Amino acid sequence: LYQASVKTGSGVSSLKEFEIEVDTIINIGKKIWAIVEAGKPVVNVEVNSASAMPAGVHSWQQLEDWQIPRSSTYRIHYTNLFGMNVVDFSYRVMFTYGGSYKGHGRYVTGATILPAALDVAWGFTFKAAVEIPTVINLGQAQNPIGGIQMNVNWSVDTVVKSSQTRASYFVDGLGNLKELN
């Protein structure tokens, strides 16, 4: 059990008790966000991301021992019957790993998928979105390891055809990145 000083609307500080549960991992962040809409990358003022943190922790800054972020770039492309590229999309899977709370566990923060490059030919519409279906504990209650599954869903549409595809990735607090397809 921990105590924290909390500012109230009247400017008076009060003490609030709260509990950090290192054995319960939660997602701090959005579960679904668009990264490409109407064939153009979505520009965000703040990066949409997910985290696998202990319950009761509200910021990655409450943890220590973070490692350098990992990143891997993936590319998809579609060609027409003439062999011309009609959609060429590159995206990055990024995350920071290894954070611990008072020496316990290995957690993930800043897990995201960002557009790196996009070219779409005339007559084609490309859309992509990211979803975080699950955040889990890969370790034990005394020494949790946060894990996050991330899916990137995209569609390529023309007047006569629509195609939808998904790629899935899993990242964890030990720094592992695995393609699930």
Which residues does each predicted region cover?
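Membrane-inserting effector segments that mediate pore formation, membrane fusion
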Residues: 3-46
